[in-house]
Design a protein with these regions (language model features):
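Conserved, mostly hydrophobic/aromatic
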Residues: 1, 15, 38, 70, ...
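Hydrophobic faces of well-ordered beta-strands that scaffold small-molecule active sites
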Residues: 1-4, 22-24, 53-59, 143-145
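Short, acidic/polar
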Residues: 5-13, 126-133
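A conserved active-site cap/scaffold subdomain adjacent to cofactor or substrate pockets
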Residues: 7-29
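Glycine-rich, proline-tolerant flexible connector loops at the mouths of alpha/beta enzymes
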Residues: 26, 146-157
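Short glycine/threonine-rich loop-to-helix capping motif typified by GTGT followed
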Residues: 66-67, 153-163
Length: 185
């Protein structure tokens, strides 16, 4: 069972004590903090897990042959939903840094998407390098890709999944050699 969480230490502890897999909707740095809490709390519950074991990081991907092509994909597949959907979460949460950008051109939302630490925008090698760097400190067992199916052509979604599976995941798998769960109990 995966339990989505974004910023609550209590949610991490809840998941750890029940054996649920936390699905972190947060930056790499915040996810690393949560993974340490999860590992500590799981141990209290009788499960000796490695750091990152049973944990998942959520990422959105825009992969291109060049950085420019990846940004073009953001413009065509992600900028609209970022502007008209995700931007409202900051307002609802009462975030002081939220502002009304509803009249801003769609192109300006490309930068907003690219600056979000949950979004991976670039070439296969640049994204793989960034994730490998993060996994060296916090080797998460799972990586969750959430595509914007309504905005993104299915061929691009399928190609992104293929690139993650064949070009990115093998490098991450080298960093996540965990004991079996039976050995953790």
């Amino acid at each position: 069972v995966f339990v989505a969480m974004a910023g609550s230490e209590e949610s991490v502890k809840y998941a750890a004590h029940r054996g649920y897999s936390p699905l972190y909707f947060s930056s790499i740095e915040r996810t690393a903090e949560f993974a340490k809490i999860y590992q500590k709390e799981a141990k209290k519950a009788g499960r000796n897990l490695s750091l990152g074991q049973n944990c998942a990081g959520v990422r959105w991907f825009a992969i291109g042959d060049t950085e420019k092509e990846a940004r073009e994909k953001v413009l065509h597949h992600d900028a609209d939903i970022t502007k008209n959907f995700y931007s409202h979460f900051r307002k609802v949460a009462g975030r002081a840094d939220s502002q009304d950008n509803s009249n801003a051109p769609l192109e300006s939302w490309v930068d907003a998407f690219c600056q979000n630490p949950q979004n991976m925008v670039g070439t296969v090698s640049s994204i793989r390098d960034e994730l490998v760097k993060a996994w060296k400190d916090n080797p998460l067992e799972y990586l969750c890709y959430i595509p914007h199916f309504a905005q993104q052509p299915k061929e691009d979604v399928i190609e992104t999944i293929r690139l993650i599976q064949e070009e990115i995941k093998p490098a991450l798998d080298e960093l996540t050699q965990y004991e079996s769960y039976e050995e953790c109990a």
